[in-house]
Each structure stands twice: as C-alpha cells, then as structure tokens.
A protein has these predicted regions:
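Condensing-enzyme catalytic core of the thiolase-fold
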Residues: 1-204
Length: 204
C-alpha cells in the first residue's frame, strides 16, 4: 500500500500503483504516468523509483551474485569493469502536460518528447539481456518523440557494468546507430555521440 499511502497523505485522486519491472521499474512507472496525462485521465502525476534493501538477507543474497562488482568504482562499457553496484535511494518526478505547467507558472526542468519500452521475451534466462529488445525500446522511443536518432549528441545508458549487460546494450545501440541510414547520414553528430551512465555511478 505504499503508493496508496502517498496518495492518501498528499490527497491525490488519480491512479496509484506500485510497478515492479526490476531495473526498468521507474521507466515503466513514468510510461504509465505519461499515458494518463496524454489521455487526460489526470492533470498531474508523480512517478519514480525506490530501492531499499532493508534486510541483511538481501545483502547476503546479492553478495553471492557474480554480476556484482567487488570494487568501489563501476566502469560500464570498460574492459576493466567488474560488474554492477547496488545503491539505495529514491527519485521522483512531478509530471504535467507542458501547456498546463506553463499556465500554472511551474518551473520546467525537462521536456519528455517520447518514451518507449519493450521486453526481451523468452531468452537464455530471465536475467540475460537481449540486444534486440534493447533496440526495440530505443526505436519506439525515437519514433514516439519524432526524433531522428542520429540528431542526438549524448546518450544516457543503463550501463550495468557486466559483460552480458554492457554487450547487449551496446549491440542494441549499434543496431539503431550503425544502420545503412546512419552510414549515409548528413547529421553532424553521426561520428560523435557521447555515451554515459549516471545510473551506474549512483547504483542500480
């Protein structure tokens, strides 16, 4: 009842629910919130993610997982990367339609032009990422935003820092940015798109 408790305390009358999609939970929650806004089922939505491993047993279980780094500095997409680092915390955003935010005099920090999601389906295991699924989510996001992928100059990645995760994500990026269309592109950023992962520095 966590989401319901927040709605109760803040006197919010829209949809409230908890979304569990592992590493994609906050993005999935945002996608649901955006849908409610665009379809005028709500005028404001609060969405985000939280991770709090409040049990010693959780830390013990995670410590046995080979995907987790033994060091302090995760290095996604680096040959010296040792794996993923877990972090605890909470991040939330308040979402409104742009015209409503401007009308209300709100401070607008960012504009979401589009969003995309996908699932890997049946693959090697439920924990193994699939590059085609990554590419599908990217493609849907760019199409939803009506943005040409090659026009961007910075890409924020998931960046787990694991061999399997980084490889699948990078292969998905190559599928989008290294197509025949990309090779014939006139966009100035085609040869240089910065790749970062703030999430890996905070913790997954």
């Amino acid at each position: 009842v966590i989401a319901g408790r927040i709605a109760n305390r803040l006197n919010l009358g829209g949809t409230n629910c908890t979304v569990d999609a592992a590493c994609a939970s906050s993005l999935s929650a945002m996608k649901m919130a955006i849908s409610d806004l665009l379809e005028y089922r709500a005028d404001m939505m609060i969405a985000g993610g939280v991770d709090a491993d409040n049990s010693p047993m959780m830390y013990m279980c995670f410590s046995k997982t080979p995907a987790f780094t033994s060091g302090e500095n995760p290095r996604p997409f680096d040959q010296d990367s040792g794996g993923v680092m877990i972090g605890e915390g909470l991040g939330m955003v308040v979402l409104k339609r742009l015209e409503d935010a401007q009308r209300d005099g709100d401070r607008v920090y960012a504009l979401i032009k589009g969003i995309g999601a996908s699932s890997d389906g049946k693959f090697k295991s439920i924990y193994a990422p699939r590059s085609s699924g990554q590419a599908k989510a990217l493609k849907r996001a760019y199409e939803d935003a009506n943005v040409e992928p090659l026009s961007i100059g910075l890409l924020e990645a998931h960046g787990t820092g694991t061999d399997a995760g980084d490889l699948a994500e990078f292969e998905g990026l190559k599928e989008i940015f290294n197509s025949d269309k990309a090779k014939n592109s006139d966009y100035p950023n085609y040869q240089h798109i910065a790749l970062g992962s703030i999430k890996s520095q905070i913790g997954h």
